[in-house]
Amino acid sequence: MNLFELSQNIGKINQNKVISDSIKNVNDELNGLTKDRMCKVYSSYVYNELKKNHILARLINTNDLGFDYEHQFILVQINKLTKDYYLIDLTYSQFIKNIEDEKVFTELLNKGYQKINNELWIQYLKNILRNNNVNSSIDEAFNKEINNNRINL
């Protein structure tokens, strides 16, 4: 466990509340802008809010994962052992044809974030990339070496 993780545990930071408050602050600041196709703007704002609140988050771009389609979102690690993460994507609704039919990512659609594991990660990537040949681990995406918050492959 690194020093940052220790400091989070000592401070008993409620990641769920910080993420929710960060999304609310971003929505207030960007009031009037459409979320569709604004993934970079929204993700960057939420990422900066999370950083201000000392939450270890990764700004992920699908291009950096080796995919042709570009989309940006955030991962926040909840627990290394269980490999659970929060996925934050305020623009996910653009990938859903019929919101009433969406059963898996209802929290993501309603709250802007959702707790996921590797199985849900694969499903999420398949939904946004419209590709069934997705072979990517959520741990690999989160733990890639980064410079200036960008992933280095």
Q: Model-predicted segments: where are they?
A:
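A structural boundary/capping signal
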Residues: 1-153
